[in-house]
Amino acid sequence: MDLFKRKVKEWVYSLSTDDHYAEYNPDETPTFNMGKRLNSNNGQVNPSQMHLNSVDEEMSMGFQNGVPSNEDINIDEFTSTESNDGVSETLLAWRHIDFWTSEHNPDLNATLSDPCTQNDITHAEEDLEVSFPNPVKASFKIHDGQEDLESMTGTSGLFYGFQLMTLDQVVAMTQAWRNVAKNLNKRSQQGLSHVTSTGSSSSMERLNGNKFKLPNIPDQKSIPPNAVQPVYAHPAWIPLITDNAGNHIGVDLAPGPNGKYAQIITFGRDFDTKFVIAENWGEFLLSFANDLEAGNWYLVDDNDDYFSGDGELVFRDKKSNGPIQDYFEVLKRRTWIKYQENLRSQQQKSQPDTSLQEQKYVPASQKKVAAEQPSTLNAESIKGEDSGSADVQSVQDHESVKIVKTEPSEAETTTVNTESLGQAEHEIKADNVDIKQESERKEDEKQPKVEEKEHVENEHVTESAKKDDDVNKQTEEMNKKEENEIRSDDAKVEEAREEFENIAL
């Protein structure tokens, strides 16, 4: 009799409740979300709820009647201990998605299920022993996935052919992937224990060869690196979208070292490299809605049958007007481009300033010594300018290089004290004395050379003078000789003239 009564109550419960996942529980008091919120506040609506409702009214402008509404969903429904990042994006995205599907593909819009109740979500969380992120809860309270895809011809998954999973399917698929992860972990532990006992890895290779009927499982990676745990399956990966071929888009509740809690990832049979495609569920939904609004879509209708539906929604980039693309490939390419841009920006920020690197730290005391040193050297060089200035300058250059080489390192300069300063000044004075002595020595060496040069020049002048005197004497003698000859000739002429006159008389 009790069993019959229970069955009757379950039947009545199924007719009177909106629960999709939650089963009838005679010990549970029925609760309603709005009534619970109003009772908790003595029948008064929370101010934040009023603000969100006013925002919803602004966002609903331009929407036609009959489009599913989520005005009764607000952030206050979610626990304050969890992050509400992505909740507002989820609400906004679903408004655009509902409006677009009702306008361009009513058959696709008809596949969207009614909302889940809080009881559904609570029971699912209890069965999976997890707490769904708030954007996921908000999404389930708008649409519980897609249904009746097989019965409705000409329709496909909402996300360019990929199906939005119902809460029942999410729980069932999560359990299936948990079994996969459990078996992988079990076989791995068995292989490690066997290798430890036998000291050989041949058994481990045989075990790996039988996993999932594959020769081996490749190394698991992620983009960005270390954002997702490097495993094939994980119990904390909750699938939300499926391609019905073993691949999923889901929420990651156990991210890697460089990941973020509740990030959205791709995983499954074809994803040895996992891709982080969004930081949260709301961000992913909003990016999909933006693609629809931007015109990155195409409806494939293979026949002219009126009853075949509006066609299958596929991705095609509007700007390039290129071919139809697989949505997984689009998400992977976008993630890779975003990762490369972030990598370049990080490299630019981490590049050191070369001008700062070339500057070497010099303490104040060392700078003072360096400032005083050139004046001392210049004074010495001026003093010996007329005697070996080039040699003195080379010595100064040598000493300046010596001073630079003996500069303390950054670690040593922190311990410079007055004693080291006095020692440095003493060494500099000693170097100045050496420079002065070197200059005097070179001046002394140069002085004999100057005297010798003057002596040689004097001898050369004396010899030249002697030669000039000899030439002058010779010239005078020749002149005198010529004068004597001329006088002798004149006398002979005079004598001949007188003889001629005597003869004439």
UniProtKB/Swiss-Prot annotation:
Query: Biased-composition ranges for Basic and acidic residues?
Result: 396-408, 424-495
Q: Which residues carry this modification: Phosphoserine?
A: 202-203, 381, 394, 400
Q: Does the keyword Transport apply?
A: no
Q: Which residues carry this modification: Phosphothreonine?
A: 376
**InterPro entries membership:** Knr4/Smi1 (IPR009203), Knr4/Smi1-like_dom (IPR018958), Knr4/Smi1-like_sf (IPR037883), KNR4/SMI1_regulator (IPR051873)
Subcellular location, principal: nucleus
Q: Which GO terms describe its molecular function?
A: DNA binding
- Alphabetically ordered keywords of this record: Cell wall biogenesis/degradation, DNA-binding, Isopeptide bond, Nucleus, Phosphoprotein, Transcription, Transcription regulation, Ubl conjugation
Q: Which residues form the signal peptide?
A: none
Polar residues bias located where? 343-358, 411-421
GO annotation, biological process: cell wall organization; fungal-type cell wall beta-glucan biosynthetic process; regulation of fungal-type cell wall biogenesis; regulation of mitotic cell cycle
Q: Which GO terms describe its cellular component?
A: cellular bud neck; incipient cellular bud site; mating projection tip; nucleus
Q: Please list the coiled coil stretches.
A: none
Which purpose does this protein serve, as stated in its record? Protein involved in the regulation of cell wall assembly and 1,3-beta-glucan synthesis, possibly through the transcriptional regulation of cell wall glucan and chitin synthesis.
Additional remark text: Present with 5680 molecules/cell in log phase SD medium.
Task: Describe its partners and assembly state.
Answer: Interacts with TYS1.
Report the sequence similarity comment from the record.
Belongs to the KNR4/SMI1 family.
Instruction: Name it.
Output: Cell wall assembly regulator SMI1
Which gene is transcribed and translated to give this protein? SMI1
